[in-house]
Amino acid sequence: MGNAYTCHRLVEEAGARGISLEIIGVHDITVGQSTDPKIYCNGKILSPVDFVINRYKWGKCKDQINRLAKKSYNPLSPFNQYINKYEQLLHLQSRAFLKPRYLLADGFADYPFLSSMLGTKMVAKGLENSMGREIFLIQKEEDLEALQQYGKEKEWLFEEFIETSYGRDVRVYSIRGEVVGCMQRRSEHDFRANVALGAGVTAYEPNDQIRQIAKAVYEQTGLDFTGIDLLFGKDRFYLCEINVMPGLEGIEQATGVNVAGRMMDMICGDF
């Protein structure tokens, strides 16, 4: 966490605006019992603060840290809800985008049934991972059986494969529904277009459809900062997923936009 590009960029831009912003590692946190509801970081009590920027998605300690703040970015309730990829497809609706056909199941699901609903080529996604982890292309029964190593308690989101978007997608960075940066990610060797997996990035000019999508996602989720991943369809974009804590390195390098600065300007405007 402490070495992450995004965290350090936010600290840098906060400092430029006279704001003291500190990186707190969740694994350094201890939460007291109900009779002593203090929160400790490396043994020291954390004091109340004006705001928290959530950059960690797991567990309950981060929820308790949010109790210290007057405001949270992103707000904790939609942050926790929309971490989950199934929740995203279940609730987000807009005429501006299409959604892949999808099913929720474990890795022991019946391949003939899944393929009859989604096509013989499909994508299996873990519900809460990012950066391309737990994303698999399923083309035959053996590919599906490989998911069984994760156990029956592991649920997967199965989606139809959008062939027109093989190895490429568009990442939109939205601040309260306004598009502040947009890039195309492209991989020459993988169906996944994640920067963390080596995909290249170039600036992408947002059109009215993309702006409508960003506005719809904000209005439906209340997420202040959102990375919206779109797949290329024949006529319209498909919603791939949204990211509740999107990284800044790729989008800032591809577009030259000071996204971290725009984020801090928005936060300053709330106080």
Residue ranges of predicted features:
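Short beta-strand-to-turn element immediately C-terminal to the catalytic PLP-Schiff-base lysine
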Residues: H91, A105, F136-Q139, S174-I175, ...
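Rossmann-like NAD(P)H-binding beta-loop-alpha module
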Residues: K99-M122
